[in-house]
Amino acid sequence: TDLVQYYGDLLTRLRMSSQSGVEIGMFGTISSGTIKRILIKLDKGQKLTEKEQTIYDTACAEMRKIIPQPQAPGAFPTGMLLGATWNREAVHQCASAVGREMDAYHVDVVLGTPNVNLHRDPLNGRVFEGYSEDPCLTAQLAPEFVKGVQEEGPLANVKHFAANNQETCRHSINVRIGERALRELYFPGFRACVQEGKVRSVMSAYNKINGESCAMNHWLLTDVLRKDWGFDGFVVSDWGAAYDQVKALSAG
């Protein structure tokens, strides 16, 4: 097709390092440089990305021991690719490599490893992060990623708890759902990470469940996570989700 031919032509114009940069997209660092080589000029969004990266680089250079910045990070399979292996050992080995690399960069907590949200919407731009649409397969593989990372030193962090399965309106959407569906579909991956993987950190989601924000949901974070499953680690909210800090702390 014309589209295949178009992108095939683009790839022939890129060096291998540039191809990797486009695929990885680390804060736009390598990607923006690649775009500049194949386009006449950057648009406003691309210029903003480049400016943000400059600020980030400067901050990291000044605070190298506090904010580690990977200079040549490895490129690892996405959750969807790992899920397609149906192979616990392969997932464990991949996670071990991630853990070793993060430890080398003095990273204490590897956020979002793993993402166990199910594949429910093909239009979800982040669906590739999760393992599968199948809660059973997810519950088999995710604990292996947790163990692989934590055996190397850094703490794993499983996200987004819970029922966070679309990007559209993800900061405000209210998921109206019964407890049976939660426990049979959306909880198994998290429960396996807690009870089998011994994950030390959980990230709460932006969305609400039956009217109650996940980041400030006592039933979710205390009754289910801590009392039912025995979790004794710490919960972090997704970025800015705990807008009522007192309620969030009280919720667990």
Regions found by a protein language model. Give the residues of each.
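Glycoside hydrolase catalytic-domain context in secreted enzymes
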Residues: 1-252
